[in-house]
Structure formats: C-alpha cells, structure tokens
C-alpha cells in the first residue's frame, strides 16, 4: 500500500479513503466509501422511516411503500415498491424478495464493514442512531445496535414469543418445538416474520456468530 501511495497516487486517491491522515493506531483505510459518503449513507440506513427496522436493515427503503420508484422504458412503465414480506410478483420464481425484507447475510456484511470502519475512525466519528433521535454513537456501537436488533428475530419477548415465529403457538410454546429455531431464508421488514425456506442454515446460521460476538 505504501508503494501505491508513493508511486501511484492516481490510483490511491480513488480507493484510499484517507491519504492525508492515518486513523486509529496509525491505520490506513482502503475503501471505496469516503468519510463524507459514509456519513450520508448511514443517515439513510439508520433512518427508521427508511432502512432501519426493529429487527435489522431492510433490503429496500420503506419510503418506497408510499412512493414507488417508476421508470419509462420504450413507453412501458416499470415500477418497484417496498414489499416487506413475500414477493407480490412471480419474477425469479416468486419465492424470493429483495424489495424490503431483512436478509441476515446482508446485515452480517454491514456489521462487519462497520466494525472495519470503526478500526480506522475509532471514537472520532459519531453518527446519529437512529437518525433523528438525537443520540450519537461511534461505528462500533452502531454495529452492536444492529446485532442486537438481529437477535430480536429469535429472542423471546416478554410474552415468550419469537418474532420469526409469527405468533404461531406451536412454535412458541409447545415443549417439542419452542426451543428449536427455524433458520428462515429472510424476514419480514416490518414484523420480523420468518419467510422463504425454513432450513437456511447457511447465511441465517450467521446469527450464531452475532450472538457469540455480542455476548
């Protein structure tokens, strides 16, 4: 990296977020997102009227629920809107939806990225979380906040129910079911209800690392 900084500044300036100063513990940050861009992205991402939900980060802003995005292609209008649960279209088999639900794989990568950024910025970068709340925290604490929200998909609430079980008594209270979690493919962006394949032990199984990392 030092060679690129000294000999290829044209490349380094495009891809190294901060060449003028080093970050926490004298680190350099290799990232496509500069500090200004990161702040702007997080302002949207941490807005509870847009991406931030009780159970993680939505795959599309809730803003588009009442304001669908439309575009005209060769006189044909195509529209996409916020759909928090199962797909309302038969496209791609109709059994998957990236227009609103919470996907654990994406949320996990977001958490990992925030922790990497925190390794560079440390406590110096404070972001409002949630947006509009007046509460500011560093990126490490924001990552922890997202991890806790993800855990709320599976943790029992005061009534003994898990959001992912969607109020099904058998799954929440039956002695043969209540302690055995289903690893759903994705989750409703508003309620946390488990959707898609219920045996998605791959990326949804990442919740185990989330729980481990947060204690």
Model-predicted regions and their roles:
Residues 1-215:
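Acidic, mature catalytic/reactive cores of soluble proteins
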């Amino acid at each position: 990296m030092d060679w690129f900084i000294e000999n290829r500044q044209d490349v380094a300036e495009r891809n190294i977020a901060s060449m003028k100063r080093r970050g926490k513990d004298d680190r350099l940050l290799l990232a496509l997102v500069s500090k200004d861009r990161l702040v702007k992205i997080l302002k949207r991402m941490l807005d509870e009227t847009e991406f931030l939900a009780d159970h993680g980060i939505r795959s599309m802003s809730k803003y588009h629920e009442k304001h669908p995005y439309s575009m005209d292609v060769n006189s044909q209008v195509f529209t996409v809107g916020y759909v928090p649960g199962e797909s309302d279209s038969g496209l791609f088999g109709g059994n998957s939806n990236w227009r609103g639900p919470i996907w654990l794989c994406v949320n996990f990568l977001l958490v990992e990225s925030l922790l990497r950024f925190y390794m560079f910025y440390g406590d110096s970068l404070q972001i409002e979380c949630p947006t509009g709340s007046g509460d500011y925290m560093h990126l490490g604490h924001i990552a922890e906040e997202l991890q806790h929200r993800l855990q709320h998909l599976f943790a029992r609430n005061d009534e003994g129910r898990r959001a992912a079980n969607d109020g099904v008594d058998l799954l929440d209270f039956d002695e043969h079911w209540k302690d055995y979690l289903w690893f759903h493919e994705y989750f409703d962006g508003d309620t946390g209800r488990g959707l898609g394949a219920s045996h998605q032990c791959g990326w949804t199984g990442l919740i185990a690392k989330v729980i481990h990392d947060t204690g």
